[in-house]
Amino acid sequence: HQLIELRNNITSWVEAGEYRRRDVPYKEILETLNTDAATMRVFMKSENGMDFRSWRNKLRLQEACQMLAGHPEMNAEQISEYIGYSDSSNFHTDFRKFTGMSASEWRRTRTKTGQSN
């Protein structure tokens, strides 16, 4: 029952775009999701195979990929700020690790092929 409630709370949290908020203390996120650190750790490992921070970054980077393809009027810095990065250099480093290329390279390849993911 507790894990079902947590799953529902996380789904609502994601749908509300809360993962984009930057500088929110982890303790506050746990309170919002009505859970504790131990339960969250077990849930994230079993459901997603990673810790909360890594999972949240993955959500942000997936959104960045969609935005790079779908919003040519926005540059990578604007997108990084929108998805919750306070430092664009961290975004660029994380994006390269996630996709294997820079944001501009990724955008170029998706623009040519018409793909968005």
Listing of model-derived features with the role each one plays in the protein:
Residues 9-24, 44, 48, 65-74, ...:
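Basic, amphipathic alpha-helical hairpins
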Residues 37, 41-55, 85-86, 95-104:
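HTH DNA-binding helix-turn interface
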Residues 46-83, 109-117:
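Terminal helix-turn-helix DNA-binding modules in bacterial transcription factors
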Residues 1-11, 15-20, 111-117:
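Inter-domain helical "communication" segments and dimerization helices
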Residues 28-36:
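Helix-turn-helix
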Residues 30, 41, 80-81:
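The alpha-helix within a helix-turn-helix
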Residues 71-107:
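Sequence-specific DNA-binding recognition helix
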Residues 2-10, 25, 57-60, 72:
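N-terminal positioning helix adjacent to the helix-turn-helix/winged-helix DNA-binding module
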